[in-house]
From Swiss-Prot:
Residues holding heme c 3: 116, 224, 227-228
Documented EC number(s): 1.7.2.2
Organism for this UniProt entry: Parabacteroides distasonis (strain ATCC 8503 / DSM 20701 / CIP 104284 / JCM 5825 / NCTC 11152)
Record-given protein name: Cytochrome c-552
Gene giving rise to this polypeptide: nrfA
Described purpose of this protein according to its UniProt entry: Catalyzes the reduction of nitrite to ammonia, consuming six electrons in the process.
Length: 494
């Protein structure tokens, strides 16, 4: 017997169908509207741009909204509980870090990063690049410029990638003058997202992956992964390389470096072969729930805005905490205060572990130096140095990542906890070495309660560093700018 729907069931089915059709229609309309907006912009360009255009202001007439929001990366007014867009002297706040980086340029100067508009200025100003008075002087290679400017792909094209990397940092000072901008992430002709730095492409190739097959949503993270990653300068040519061949976890990259016999520097106190993590933001973010659910970097750091009927990406790249209504609340219904506190809770817990690890690791370096001074042999110190290397790699991997405590809180806690364990093991191993040498008392600790005391303890002449830097900024940088201006390399707002 045929079963008929009751009247109310029929109407319910009809209503449900209409709702589904309406929603699908709205989605289709939104897609078509977005496509029409993009088509309209592309068909009404006022300036034709071809090739690598490093002067960001050349894009303003075609993309005024994107350009104006990009200019806002110069803003330094936002501050959250732990970060923001202000330059904060981290060594002043955490003098233990001076000890951890003894023998490396970061012990001289390390501040929290500002927005992309400050990329060139901040690099010139940091003590880490020294004060080179000629093109062939200075402690750093030209590789250090790689992520700072759209002038980089221009010069790589002109010089060849190998030649770009192997020069001195100062040799390109007159060429790399425009801060991170349009051409770093977009093809000038059509503004499609593209990869402008070879290291990411090469890392994919070594893993048997084809980056050209990436989806549009994946590209909204991969353009960031050109720079916001762990990397190192390989060989005498200082070739920029991502250590992803074995994987992208902290242990995978450590295994890669161990196999290569690589160390960024030898620690001045402990003599441990130290790995300096850069900023493994992409790697850590991929281990978190948001990336695992398909959320891209741009979804949270460059949310869409609407103006005059036009929908566009906000190019004021910054912390999502500065715009919770357009980031977190797009998906989450909780209040701004609740969502902000959710982030702070994760950061507080990671920070607690970080503080303990920094304290123990600083002591481990000092105690290792004490053991050397007491006559310890390389064979006796072998295990100590390995443990210190492992502990510091885990500390730096977690600390150097921007936003890691939010991106992947469980992974950050695991990494820092493992680092703390390694640091404690290193201290215990040193105590055993000292006992064999006949010393069983506590190792005397120097006073490194301030940045100045810590820098003095590791032998830095900061007055000389600052004097040399001032001379460099007042003489060499103006020469670079003058030559760039004469060669028409500078954007109007630089």
């Amino acid at each position: 017997m045929e079963k008929k729907l009751k009247s109310w069931q029929g109407w319910l089915l009809f209503g449900g169908t209409m709702v589904v059709v309406f929603v699908l229609g709205m989605i289709a309309a939104s897609v078509n509207e977005r496509h029409a907006e993009v088509t309209s912009v592309m068909n009404n360009k006022k300036t034709e741009i071809t090739g690598i255009e490093a002067r960001n202001d050349k894009f303003e007439s075609n993309y005024p909204r994107e350009y104006q929001t990009w200019e806002a990366t110069a803003d330094t007014s936002f501050k959250s509980l732990y970060n923001g867009n202000q330059a904060v002297d981290v060594l002043e706040a955490r003098p233990e870090m001076v000890i951890l980086w003894a023998g490396y340029a970061f012990s001289k100067d390390y501040s929290t990063p500002r927005g992309h508009m400050h990329a060139i200025e901040d690099m010139r100003n940091t003590l880490r690049v020294g004060a080179p008075m000629t093109e062939n002087e200075g402690p750093q290679p030209a590789t250090c410029w790689t992520c700072k400017s759209p002038d980089v792909p221009r010069m790589m094209q002109a010089m060849g990638v190998d030649n770009f990397y192997k020069g001195k940092w100062a040799s390109l000072g007159k060429e790399i003058v425009n801060p991170i901008g349009c051409a770093d992430c977009h093809e000038p002709e059509n503004m499609n997202l593209h990869i402008s730095r070879p290291a990411l492409i090469e890392a994919f190739q070594r893993q048997g992956k084809d980056i050209t097959k990436a989806t549009q949503q994946e590209m909204r993270s991969l353009v960031c992964a050109q720079c916001h990653v762990e990397y190192y300068f390989k060989g005498d040519g200082k070739y920029l390389t991502f250590p992803w061949d074995k994987g992208s976890t902290v242990e995978d990259m450590e295994a890669y470096y161990d196999e290569a016999g690589f160390a960024d520097y030898t620690h001045k106190l402990s003599r441990a072969p130290i790995l300096k993590a850069q900023h493994p933001d992409y790697e850590i973010s991929q281990m978190g729930i948001h990336a695992q659910r398909g959320v891209s970097c741009a979804d949270c750091h460059m949310p869409y805005k609407s103006e005059g009927g036009v929908k566009y990406s906000d190019h004021h790249i910054q912390s999502p905490l500065a715009m919770i209504d357009r980031t977190c609340q797009v998906c989450h219904r909780e209040s701004e205060e609740t969502l902000r506190n959710n982030v702070y809770e994760r950061q507080n817990k990671a920070n607690e572990m970080r503080n303990r690890l920094e304290t123990e690791l600083a002591k481990a370096h000092v105690e290792a130096k004490f053991a050397w001074d007491k006559g310890a042999t390389e064979d006796q110190m072998k295990d100590v140095l390995k443990l210190i290397r492992q502990a510091q790699w885990r500390w730096d991997f977690g600390v150097a990542s921007h936003g890691g405590a939010f991106h992947a809180p469980q992974e950050i806690q695991r990494i820092l906890g493992n680092g703390l364990d390694k640091a404690m093991q290193a201290r215990l191993a040193t105590a055993k070495v000292l006992a064999k040498l006949g010393y069983t008392d506590d190792v005397p600790m120097p006073d490194f309660s301030t940045k100045e005391k810590a820098q003095q303890y590791i032998g830095l002449d900061m007055a000389a560093e600052r004097t040399a830097k001032e001379k460099f900024l007042n003489t060499i940088v103006p020469q670079w700018m003058k030559e760039a201006q004469e060669n028409n390399r500078l954007a109007k707002n630089i």
